[in-house]
């Protein structure tokens, strides 16, 4: 009787141990499968993150005053004090321009592409319209200012000479008078187009250039140019280097 009980106990214990082994083995297989799936999912996620999205062309807006215009190009003196030359295609929308693309017009330029500094080689102009914000100077004054800025930027002494009224004040610390176009052209180029003068005039923001009684100043500060209203239009009446 006792022997039978002992034998039954041994059988029951063996069955318990066997079932435990099976459960443990299944658990290990499930863990391995789960780890493998997680690893594969992680790899897939890592792959998705590493995919590079190609850069998209940017859209931009620039405000400025047109200082030079032709059928295929226009040069803008922007409200940031930069001079940018844009190419113009036949499909440019100009329906928002009252007087067309012309020197002295304050405009808003909508473009697509990459604008690097003053270079617009990779830019396509989509639309040119009248600017909502307006300069304080008259259109006649803006046309004159644009011609002067271009002559100074290009260091074109001959053109600049013809944008002056004589006798002309040429103040380099000593008050000097220049009597004629020929005398102005005979001046040393380095004396006329100093680095500081070219920088000051070229960075003029025509939207904030103030007019006074009979003219305006071109330049961020000294050195600057005094531009006055004369019987022959707006002309430079003074160069002030100090």
Provide a role label for each language-model segment.
Residues 126-150:
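Short, low-complexity N-terminal intrinsically disordered segments enriched in polar/charged residues
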Residues 81-91:
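A short macromolecule-binding patch
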Residues 2, 7, 15, 19-20, ...:
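Short, flexible, surface-exposed loop segments at domain boundaries
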Residues 103, 142-143, 159-211:
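Short solvent-exposed beta->alpha transition segments
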Residues 59, 79-81, 220-222:
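Glycine-centered tight beta-turn/hairpin loop motif at sheet-sheet or coil-to-beta transitions
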Residues 91-97:
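Short alpha-helix capping/helix-loop boundary micro-motifs
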Residues 147-159:
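Short helix-adjacent coil turns
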């Amino acid at each position: 009787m006792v022997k039978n009980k002992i034998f039954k106990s041994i059988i029951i214990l063996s069955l318990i141990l066997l079932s435990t082994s099976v459960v443990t083995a299944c658990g290990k297989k499930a863990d391995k499968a789960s780890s493998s799936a997680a690893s594969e999912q992680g790899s897939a996620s890592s792959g998705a993150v590493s995919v590079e999205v190609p850069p998209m062309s940017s859209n931009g807006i620039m405000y400025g005053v047109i200082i030079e215009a032709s059928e295929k190009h226009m040069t803008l003196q922007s409200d940031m004090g930069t001079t940018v030359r844009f190419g113009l295609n036949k499909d440019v929308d100009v329906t928002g321009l009252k007087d067309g693309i012309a020197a002295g017009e304050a405009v808003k330029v909508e473009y697509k592409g990459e604008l690097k500094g003053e270079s617009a080689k990779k830019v396509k102009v989509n639309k040119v319209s009248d600017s909502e914000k307006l300069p304080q100077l008259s259109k006649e004054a803006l046309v004159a200012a644009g011609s002067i800025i271009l002559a100074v930027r290009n260091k074109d002494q001959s053109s600049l000479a013809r944008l002056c009224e004589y006798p002309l004040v040429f103040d380099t610390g000593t008050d000097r008078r220049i009597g004629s176009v020929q005398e102005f052209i005979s001046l040393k180029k380095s004396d006329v187009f100093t680095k500081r003068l070219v920088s000051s005039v070229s960075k003029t923001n025509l939207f904030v250039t103030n007019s006074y009684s009979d003219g305006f100043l071109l330049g961020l500060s000294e050195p600057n140019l005094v531009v006055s209203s004369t019987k022959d239009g707006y002309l430079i009446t003074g160069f002030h280097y100090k």
